[in-house]
Amino acid sequence: MLALSRKLNESIMLGNDIEITILEIKGDQVKIGIKAPKSVPIYRKEIYLQIQESNKEAIDGGVSLEAISKLF
């Protein structure tokens, strides 16, 4: 993992088109801004993990193709 130090209003570039800027620092919280193309999904990690778990449950849900075909 690369660890970088940034001060208020300083940025980090990821590739050519993603910019992460430090917007605010209050106590132990840091507010960041992210400029990225709309095609790049951006999630907080806890939300990303929930999405992954939901996708896994959907796959493992035991719904058969036969049951799905009966819906149509």
Curated annotation (Swiss-Prot):
<dbReference type="GO" id="GO:0005829">
    <property type="term" value="C:cytosol"/>
</dbReference>
<comment type="similarity">
    <text>Belongs to the CsrA/RsmA family.</text>
</comment>
<keyword id="KW-0694">RNA-binding</keyword>
<dbReference type="GO" id="GO:0045947">
    <property type="term" value="P:negative regulation of translational initiation"/>
</dbReference>
<dbReference type="GO" id="GO:1902208">
    <property type="term" value="P:regulation of bacterial-type flagellum assembly"/>
</dbReference>
<dbReference type="InterPro" id="IPR003751">
    <property type="entry name" value="CsrA"/>
</dbReference>
<dbReference type="GO" id="GO:0044781">
    <property type="term" value="P:bacterial-type flagellum organization"/>
</dbReference>
<dbReference type="GO" id="GO:0048027">
    <property type="term" value="F:mRNA 5'-UTR binding"/>
</dbReference>
<dbReference type="GO" id="GO:0006109">
    <property type="term" value="P:regulation of carbohydrate metabolic process"/>
</dbReference>
<comment type="function">
    <text>A translational regulator that binds mRNA to regulate translation initiation and/or mRNA stability. Usually binds in the 5'-UTR at or near the Shine-Dalgarno sequence preventing ribosome-binding, thus repressing translation. Its main target seems to be the major flagellin gene, while its function is anatagonized by FliW.</text>
</comment>
<dbReference type="Pfam" id="PF02599">
    <property type="entry name" value="CsrA"/>
</dbReference>
<keyword id="KW-0678">Repressor</keyword>
<keyword id="KW-1005">Bacterial flagellum biogenesis</keyword>
<dbReference type="InterPro" id="IPR036107">
    <property type="entry name" value="CsrA_sf"/>
</dbReference>
<keyword id="KW-0963">Cytoplasm</keyword>
<protein>
    <recommendedName>
        <fullName>Translational regulator CsrA</fullName>
    </recommendedName>
</protein>
<keyword id="KW-0810">Translation regulation</keyword>
<comment type="subunit">
    <text>Homodimer; the beta-strands of each monomer intercalate to form a hydrophobic core, while the alpha-helices form wings that extend away from the core.</text>
</comment>
<dbReference type="GO" id="GO:0006402">
    <property type="term" value="P:mRNA catabolic process"/>
</dbReference>
